[in-house]
């Protein structure tokens, strides 16, 4: 993806076999995994441009950007922003008081975007509508990808397993969740977005588009492009009304393969991440 330079769909998709599409999907997944694990300094200009555009979509002015070198340094700066539980409470309250939290509005437009992208998928999208087999409605098994295709598992299911689910395992379960748990120390943290570690859903819808299995309108491509730019360009970020706190990417990331998986999933090694200020959380 360039500017949304979602890359163009592969040529002559009508004659492309499921196996060929899968091989192309593996390359796309690796591109996004590399972004998710990048240790290059943040592209601050791109980040601030895309965050300003996303703020504008919820009718908010450009915030002041506060850059920090680690999530640890961000914590004192984001005190008072709503936690995830507080955002859910606002959504569930039939008569909420006051102005909706900015983070809630951001979550809403992100969810709406994902719904529109799903509607552009040419097959039933497992992201929103679980695809099941047979009269009993059993879920499709997760098998080695080529074996799965040969066994009749739909390509759309294999792509969801092999891109969306696999990148979530690597970048959420394998990275951001243990780091966040270490950072929180058992207490609540304000809701945030994860920049490069939000790659799973962006990569999934990018791959479907590039494989010729989804069609998105110009506005959706532009909107997706801004979220993609954040994945390619920065670490975690906490949005506030006046200030948006953004974390640079780590200085060091060391991973190891997750045993028994089919889609090149990885996880952090113990102590496998160090941020630019020296914060080096020790992971169990």
Residue ranges and their predicted role:
Residues 1-284:
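Short, glycine-biased loop/turn motifs at secondary-structure junctions and
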């Amino acid at each position: 993806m360039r500017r949304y330079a979602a890359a163009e769909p592969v040529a002559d998709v009508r004659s492309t076999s499921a196996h060929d599409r899968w091989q192309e999907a593996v390359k796309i997944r690796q591109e996004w995994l590399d972004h998710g694990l990048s240790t290059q300094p943040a592209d601050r200009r791109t980040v601030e441009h895309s965050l300003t555009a996303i703020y504008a979509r919820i009718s908010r002015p450009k915030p002041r950007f506060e850059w920090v070198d680690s999530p640890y340094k961000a914590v004192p700066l984001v005190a008072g922003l709503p936690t995830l539980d507080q955002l859910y409470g606002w959504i569930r309250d039939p008569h909420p008081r006051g102005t909706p939290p900015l983070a809630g509005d951001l979550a809403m437009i992100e969810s709406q975007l994902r719904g529109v992208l799903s509607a552009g998928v040419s097959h039933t999208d497992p992201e929103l509508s679980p695809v099941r087999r047979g009269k009993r409605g059993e879920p499709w098994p997760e098998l080695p990808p080529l074996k799965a295709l040969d066994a009749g598992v739909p390509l759309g299911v294999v792509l969801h397993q092999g891109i969306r689910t696999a990148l979530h395992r690597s970048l959420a379960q394998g990275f951001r969740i243990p780091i966040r748990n270490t950072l929180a120390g058992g207490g609540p943290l304000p809701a945030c977005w994860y920049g490069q570690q939000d790659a799973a859903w962006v990569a999934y819808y990018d791959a479907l588009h590039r494989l010729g299995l989804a069609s998105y309108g110009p506005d959706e491509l532009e909107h997706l492009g801004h979220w993609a730019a954040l994945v390619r360009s920065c670490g975690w970020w906490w949005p506030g009304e006046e200030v948006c706190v953004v974390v640079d990417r780590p200085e060091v990331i060391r991973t190891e393969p997750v045993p028994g998986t089919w889609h090149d999933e990885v996880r952090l090694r113990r102590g496998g991440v160090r941020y630019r200020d020296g914060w080096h959380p020790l992971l169990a």
